[in-house]
Structures are given as structure tokens and as C-alpha cells.
Amino acid sequence: MEELDIIRMNDSFDRPNWDEYFMLQAELAKLRSNCMTRQVGAVIVRNHRQLATGYNGTPPGIKNCFEGGCKRCQLRMEGKIESGASLDRCLCNHAEANAIMHCAILGIEAGSKNAILYSTFMPCLECSKMAITIGIKEIICLDTYPETDYDLIKESAVTIKRLDKDKIQYWAKTLLNL
């Protein structure tokens, strides 16, 4: 049998840290979004293990947003509704809500034992309330969101961390060998 060369790794081996790794998973999830106005991905993690993913879009069985399933998003794209307005009329579930619902559907207790919510955007007020309710201990995001209540999140003792978007883009390019 032919002998294999053993590649020795050293301390300088370059790889994403855990936060970067799971944010890349959220970035991948957002590619499944069917929302015309904003694409968001989310991942719930506990003990460095991914519990659930979510992306924003219409509920299962409903016409995709980009196919005309959400009239609110259509009006937004036509410039008839401003960003952040009439969110109660939007049919798209948010990525964070979808990840939380997937945990419920699968019978996974998401929030206990220091679970982390990774999201490509800071969660809105409603998704923040859901994350607090299930016991998420930390929210890690890439971008801000205008409908976030930071005071509520801080009052609940959930920590917030914003990652460097350039670093995530670096890893995405590395993945694609660009």
C-alpha cells in the first residue's frame, strides 16, 4: 500500500471562528429567501451545534413573495409603501421566527442552556420578543434593522454582538476560491 503524506497543521492555520462559521450558515440560509424586499437568514446554535435555520419568506403552501404572494412587498417594490411601514400586512415570516418555529416543529428546546441566535440582520421587535421568550442568551448579527428595540433586548439581559461584515465576506470568498 502506498504511504500517504501527512499534512501537519500548525497554530497559524486559518479558519473561521465559531461566530464567523455560524454567520456563514445564516448567509447561506438567506439564499433561500423568497422575499422581494429583504433577504435574511438565521441560525439557532447551542454548544457549537446548529439546532435550526430559517430564512424570510411566505409560509409553506403560499405563493412565493417574488411570485406575487405578498401584496405588501409588491407595494414596497413599487414605491407605494416605505421601508418599515405596514409590516403587519406582510405575509413573509421573518428568518428568526422561522428558525424558532422549526425548533418547535422538531421538538427542540432552543432557548435553554445559552443558545445563540445568529442573524444576517438584527431581529425586529417581534422576533426579538420571541427570542427573549424562548430564552436566547445572545444575538449575533451583521447588519442593523430599523424596527429593533435595543432597550428591550438589554433589559432582558440578552447580549448583542455585531460581526465584521468584511470578515464574513473574506470567508465567503475563501470558500469560493475567489
Where on the chain are the PLM-derived regions?
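Zinc-dependent deaminase catalytic domain
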Residues: 1-178
